[in-house]
């Protein structure tokens, strides 16, 4: 029964806009859930328009990467060993890259992204050779896949990569991409040549400790800006103060900046930059609003439960929180009051999945 | 926000990310009972089941497999991985036989397993081994360093183990206390040599031990012990060999007051000539004993515990029944000045006048060569301090202690962890005990009075615990000092609907002439562990 409904929903998705003469673009939210769900939510209607079952997901739909035209979503499944590309109109799998092959098991730690032209996927791979009686961990690498490669995609280019990369972010000009790990690395997309490396471990902020960051939700919409919390201590010994800062990477200009806004007083998992007034919203068990023009925490409210991920309407008029459990909640960016809460059908666990916004 | 609350936030965040990252980790089955079928194994059994992957390079030398030595539980865990990760279809009897054979031929000498025994004995809330600055974070944050210390291998084989870790758990390098350093570089370039020097494959100790004939444990033994929260016990143990290092054992136990505790039958297999693993039932509860035979073959020491609640158990000592006269235990140990108390003396070959030293008078109520019940009166003039107890010509120092006032209560464990239950996982309780001490003059050690009868309560550990009402939600402490955590899962009554975690101070109170002496410990109530491997 369930797959039939899913298909029906999938077919009707986006149907309405074709009927109108001048289709107004709408925001759709994408999120994954255990064991194989990819949900499409009409944000304004507060409605799940599609519950797509990803083939051979094997446990969890973690990372979600929409294509720039919003027609497809690439999801990391099969315990980080496979990438499945789903056509959001039909709900069908149109792309599949099983990263492991032969005696080599390959994982990607959430480090998958798509180029701005939608033609290539950039994947940071962690390969291990499995011998008869031993494992041999190999050096990591970047693998580039063509998005039109179909259901047995193989990389078209492979380059050496640093260890412990947790996020890949393409630069807006499509010529290079960033990899976030020990440092912020930049690589030429065509040749794999390392173009630069900026400090994260040694971020060059006098008096501050080495920062701690673990960001694996590559949310950069709607501004082509990536923001994430960074934790450190300022000073040493008895006078040490725990600091939460925002790291901001502008994918258009390549500018990297850090901004303090509070002595650590809350756990924050993820953040999103609003198109309005330099505001940034962050989430975990609280929803916070930060004014990055002034570098201050403007407001903070308790949430009914923990949410790992956050995103925002394209025009900034609404904040979305999701991940962790089986609901997505909608918040007023001015008052931080909840406007709506949408329970996903069947209440499947979103866990660490990514909340993404597409415009269709 | 206070630093401690920031620590608390960090801990949560770290715990959260920990769970998030370990999604790919293989679960553990409960440890199988290891003593029900007498196995016989030789190299051929290993060849049959293991050589398909572990190529036999020279006769009896199997790749990888022949380059490590471990405890029986270490072998059990490795073979579990062969079955569940590498899809080895291995019948239980062959598995048990191979664990036995490899523990005997590639095991650990008693001196090599000594430091990490507490992990084999499943002792709860033990401080981990101190093995230098980098190992606690590098290797001791997911499991104990005791697990590491219970293996012997050379540098190249330690390196292969690092490859297994990262290959099997690719999120390892991304977790807290790994991502803050060049984990892979340290683990592959620095640690193998260090571990190889600390815990090498080839040792004098093992060469000496492996060729010694195994002692026959058959015969009669005298048992004494102590179970925290329950008290002391004494009794006898009869052991019969059934072949192939397997035994049947019968314990007959009683409390110091003479109340029967149980007639307990245990199936025992002895590994490596000294590792006693028993499986028994006390009433309807499945229990195990993990004991070690002393090198002279005359004494077994270790711990019994409940199979399903390994945190519940106690210390066990068994001495050969044959042997020179000796006093093993006096219960209770502490005797208050100006009072008369009944005590039990447990020993071997006990015969003659009983004395507890100056200022005491002893009346024997009942006597046998192994148990003497006596009434001991301590005069008002008696001097506080440790006492030797003498029976006839046998004397044992520091078996009892005379006191007027308890100066200090030391609550153990000083730092305890209890876990809420959830799903099919039972809560993990935490047992506390309060040990009394008399502070002595400068330069002298305090006098230990042993476990005291105290009242128990819990208080919030800090301001955050007050605010979160941890005392209300996290659980209850029982009159015997056992903390039973609250139910698992999110609690809608709590802020953020958080689970019943808590940060508590455990307080022991002893009333002394209207004045309360306090002792305290720190208790963290946290979420369940999803798997409990045989060696934590």
Predicted region positions:
Chain B
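Beta-strand/beta-sandwich contexts
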Residues: 320-353, 394-446
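C-terminal capping alpha-helices of c-type cytochrome domains
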Residues: 87-117, 170-210
